[in-house]
Amino acid sequence: MAIKSVGSFILTALISTPLCSFAAQYPLTVTDLDGRAITLQHEPQRIILQDGRDIMAMALLDRDNPFRRVVAWNNLARKQDINTWKMLQEKWPQSAQILDMGFSDKGNVDLESVISRQPDLMIAQLRAKPALEESGVISKLSALNIPVLFVDYEINPGKDTAPSIDLLGKVLNREENAKAYTDYYRQQLDAIRQKTANITPKANVFVEALAGNSDACCFTHGHNGWGGLVEAVGANNIGSQLLPGASGFVSLEKVISMKPDAYIMTGSKRGNSQVLPLGLQADPQEVNRQAERLLSRTGVSNIPTIEAKRAYGIYHHFYNHPWNIVGMAYLAKDIYPQTFSDLNPDDSWHYIVRHFTTLPDLPFVFSWQQGE
């Protein structure tokens, strides 16, 4: 769905700092995505990012430099999304000097090194809360009066992503920047949902998350992550019907028996991995070669959906990403191609980059379609 460009004077206004009418007053008490009341005594200036993908949220808010306030983070891009890290490092070279604490969902971290950076806020993903509690990270930070603010793009992505960005905008005194993005986000999601609301029967979709990352097929998500995104665009996620938890493996025989209407593989460029190397500055020929190899795996080629050429690939990190509206656009087009024949998800990414950030608008390959 192409979006007409606006005048340069509007673009300048969009990427400028917030107007005083949105200025936050501190001390400030907010309710995070875990339903907890969090009080901040002053505007946070030294932030920990438990999940490094939140740097893309910071890019929407601190547009001149999303690393300006970050003193420690889990640099997932360096490990799992090589070209995104290259882009960030080239644009903001100081990012390479920020402590990479390797903060895992299991709560493993050298907390003393993190605390030595004198943080005044930790932004964390809600899915990590149990591990952070069990490891004592939350209690230790609380004892030092360092607030932990939970956001969510994965447990319930269609519902929680926009409120998470609004929350961060309020906490970081960037409400106008946040609102500009979330207004766009909600408009795009509403447009998708209006088109799929009356579709019956709903398409049945299987998402093989990180296809090729394991010798076994088929790893997938339940109601969260990719499952939540599939459901948000008006389709049935097969993993939600079969898994007791957030993610897990479904046997190939079971996938075949479920007769999905669309088979979607996700991936990103991550070293020598065998997954789809989708992402910024990806090589379309490399993506196509890897996709064809994945579809030729023993048994996978026998899935009726693949025989019918209804297999697709999508950039993996949309499953837990503040820009997941782009991922939902790709899903909508892949799952309901006739309904969304005029939708161009690439345009959504370009629009976000150009209107809500100062990131370079690099070429990318975020999707793949069988037979093209």
Tell what function each PLM region has:
Residues 1-5:
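Positively charged n-region of N-terminal signal peptides that target proteins for export
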